Amino acid sequence: MRDNTQHYRELFLEDTPLMDVRAPVEYHKGAFPHTVNRPLMNDIERQKVGTSYKQHGQQAAIALGHELVCGAVKAERLAAWKAFAEANPNGYLYCFRGGLRSQIVQQWLKQDAGIDYPRVIGGYKALRNFLFETTRAAVDECDFVLVGGLTGCGKTEVIAALDNSLDLEGHANHRGSSFGRRATPQPAQIDFENRLAIDILKKRHRGVGQFVLEDEGRIVGSCSLPLELYQGMQGYPLVWLEDGFEQRVARILKDYVIDLRSEFERVVGAEEGFAVFSAYLQKSLAGIVKRLGGERYQRLAAILVQALEEQGRDGSVETHRGWIEGLLKEYYDPMYAFQRQSKEDRVEFRGNQAEVIAYLRQRQALRPS
């Protein structure tokens, strides 16, 4: 039999399969990328047992748990645990603290299925704390540099080209702007933090000691950056990415119109996908109406409506350039120019995409071991 484990680092580095036996409501608040939820109790059962524990103590709660999870219910859950254990002989199971729930699942697997299956000592809480400390330690011990630039200049492409980058927007499943939503939902806050920490852990294991991040605000869609990381970002050196206006318009047209429409249609189907995509763009523009001002908003909204009608009718996207150009010239570029004033003394390099990528690679290579 394999031993229970406290080797949290290896679990994440090796993407070890984990069976989370917490209730679904706990799992959906936060889990880990390589886990599946095979609960001992469902949400209602957990609530009843919790109430019994508060009112009558541990023994009464345990007795109620055995009463609720018995017969066909127990057999069904045992079959799910057995299937996971057989499919993942190198895996582990865990509950919140590695205590009673995971021990009961271990006991039932042994007694009723003849399977010895190890658990994670300390459970979810210990794994979560380990990842929290992973991020904190990286902020304390590693070097960081930010990539900034005007909207549409290709910062995400720079991040993707580097092997020492942390893709904050990728982990958040959001592009970070008022128009940044994707066709699929964002992760829960805890899931976002866990994914980022695992990325940091794996890169540091490969020897990365200098990380490149996109210059972001504290909030990426609905996901908040870890506070210690965001605080550090207020002082990290900055590399400024430059690109021509027409190139930026073309990139935004591709990302936020052509590709995003396709993304929505893949998720919900062609007809409904275009309708959802159209409503999303209009809602996003309406979301910044106060910052645009009424007259400017009405003008850009009219162009957007016309562009969507043409796109829906014959696939043409050229009219979209009108509202994109207007947003850049009249909203995003002035806003970035204002924000950049406070960061100017931190800019250590400026260049186009190829120059910035080359500079950042050289910067990493020159870092002392």
From Swiss-Prot:
The active site is at C95. GO terms for biological process: tRNA wobble uridine modification. Keywords: Selenium, Transferase. SMART domains: RHOD. InterPro entries: P-loop_NTPase, Rhodanese-like_dom, Rhodanese-like_dom_sf, SelU. Its EC number is 2.9.1.3. One of its GO terms (molecular function) is tRNA 2-selenouridine synthase activity. Residues 12-136 form the Rhodanese domain. It is an enzyme of class 2 (transferase). It catalyses: 5-methylaminomethyl-2-thiouridine(34) in tRNA + selenophosphate + (2E)-geranyl diphosphate + H2O + H(+) = 5-methylaminomethyl-2-selenouridine(34) in tRNA + (2E)-thiogeraniol + phosphate + diphosphate; 5-methylaminomethyl-2-thiouridine(34) in tRNA + (2E)-geranyl diphosphate = 5-methylaminomethyl-S-(2E)-geranyl-thiouridine(34) in tRNA + diphosphate; 5-methylaminomethyl-S-(2E)-geranyl-thiouridine(34) in tRNA + selenophosphate + H(+) = 5-methylaminomethyl-2-(Se-phospho)selenouridine(34) in tRNA + (2E)-thiogeraniol; 5-methylaminomethyl-2-(Se-phospho)selenouridine(34) in tRNA + H2O = 5-methylaminomethyl-2-selenouridine(34) in tRNA + phosphate. Monomer. Involved in the post-transcriptional modification of the uridine at the wobble position (U34) of tRNA(Lys), tRNA(Glu) and tRNA(Gln). Catalyzes the conversion of 2-thiouridine (S2U-RNA) to 2-selenouridine (Se2U-RNA). Acts in a two-step process involving geranylation of 2-thiouridine (S2U) to S-geranyl-2-thiouridine (geS2U) and subsequent selenation of the latter derivative to 2-selenouridine (Se2U) in the tRNA chain. Belongs to the SelU family. PANTHER family: TRNA 2-SELENOURIDINE SYNTHASE. This is tRNA 2-selenouridine synthase. It comes from Pseudomonas paraeruginosa (strain DSM 24068 / PA7).
